[in-house]
């Protein structure tokens, strides 16, 4: 997959079929947009392309209220590639970019840089200065520049629009099953194995590992039945997020029992944990029985 951070990058493939957005989480709504782009690109012989922003625009415009992210930038790229996207133009978001009118943005990035033949927006998406760009602006500009412009409808779950905000809220409330349905996959916490208090064997009676989460949104405090990836093998595991009431420690942490001693030996290495099912908190003995 081609990943460019400059509109003048000579590696950019043209012509293209394009969508625009941050796409944090790559939930089912985002996936619907990606499928539309990939399908259209296959028909018109162009490169399926995503124009995105890094960092998140709100972290520049409204840093005090910027949302925690569901994915790292690298995780978003991996997901896009899996969905069939073959090119990403990741625009470094700055106040200068925010000051561009919708028309300037389209002409500079979508027309001049990517030679877009078709542009898809998610319903309600806006771009450009004061969020002035929308599907109506694109359709008006399409007459001049000769591209198609279309809007992809929302995806709903139980009558509620699926969005990155709704997914974050579900996770922050510990509703990992709801988040899984909105994402179309389990939500994973990925991070470095860190030094713990070495209580796994002598006190708890089973091997444990502590990780420092790499993902920005960590589910609410609780005990979750999970799966942990160690050396390319998934192990059933139990993960505790939050305080450690069983050992009298109030620090927020992510600790897991992965059914293999290898997890705890990987200090300084990455582990991936997929959140599957929430269950009630219990004492160490109860966790050992899962």
Predicted regions and their residues:
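A glycine-rich helix N-cap at a beta->alpha junction
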Residues: 75-87
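Residue-level signal for inorganic ion chemistry
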Residues: 27, 80, 119, 179, ...
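Glycine-rich, highly charged phosphate/nucleotide-binding loops
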Residues: 68-76, 100-106
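Phosphate/ribose-recognition catalytic cores of enzymes acting on nucleotide-derived substrates
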Residues: 196-274, 279, 290
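N-terminal catalytic cores of NTP/NDP-binding nucleotidyl/phosphoryl-transfer enzymes
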Residues: 9-72
């Amino acid at each position: 997959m081609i990943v460019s951070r400059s509109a003048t990058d000579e590696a950019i493939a043209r012509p293209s079929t394009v969508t625009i957005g941050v796409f944090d989480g790559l939930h089912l709504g985002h996936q619907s947009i990606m499928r539309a782009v990939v399908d259209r690109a296959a028909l018109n012989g162009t490169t399926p392309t995503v124009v995105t922003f890094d960092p998140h625009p709100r972290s520049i415009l409204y840093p005090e209220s910027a949302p925690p992210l569901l994915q790292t930038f690298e995780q978003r790229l991996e997901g896009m590639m899996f969905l069939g996207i073959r090119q990403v133009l990741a625009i470094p978001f700055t106040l200068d970019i925010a000051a561009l009118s919708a028309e300037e943005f389209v002409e500079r990035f979508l027309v001049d840089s990517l030679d877009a033949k078709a542009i898809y927006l998610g319903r309600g998406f806006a771009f450009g200065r004061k969020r002035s760009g929308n599907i109506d602006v694109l359709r008006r500009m399409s007459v001049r520049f000769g591209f198609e412009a279309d809007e992809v409808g929302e995806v709903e779950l139980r009558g509620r629009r699926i969005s990155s905000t709704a997914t974050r809220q579900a996770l922050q409330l510990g509703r990992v099953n709801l988040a899984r349905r909105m994402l179309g996959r389990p939500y994973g916490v990925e991070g470095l194995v860190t030094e713990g208090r070495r209580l796994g064997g002598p006190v708890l009676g089973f091997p444990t590992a502590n990780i420092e989460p790499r993902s920005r949104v960590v589910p609410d405090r609780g005990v979750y039945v999970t799966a942990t990836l160690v050396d390319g093998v998934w192990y059933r595991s139990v993960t505790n997020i939050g305080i450690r009431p069983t050992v009298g420690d109030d620090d927020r942490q992510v600790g897991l029992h992965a059914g293999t001693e290898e997890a705890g030996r990987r200090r300084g290495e990455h582990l991936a944990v997929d959140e599957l099912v929430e269950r009630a908190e219990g004492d160490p003995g109860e966790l050992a029985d899962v």
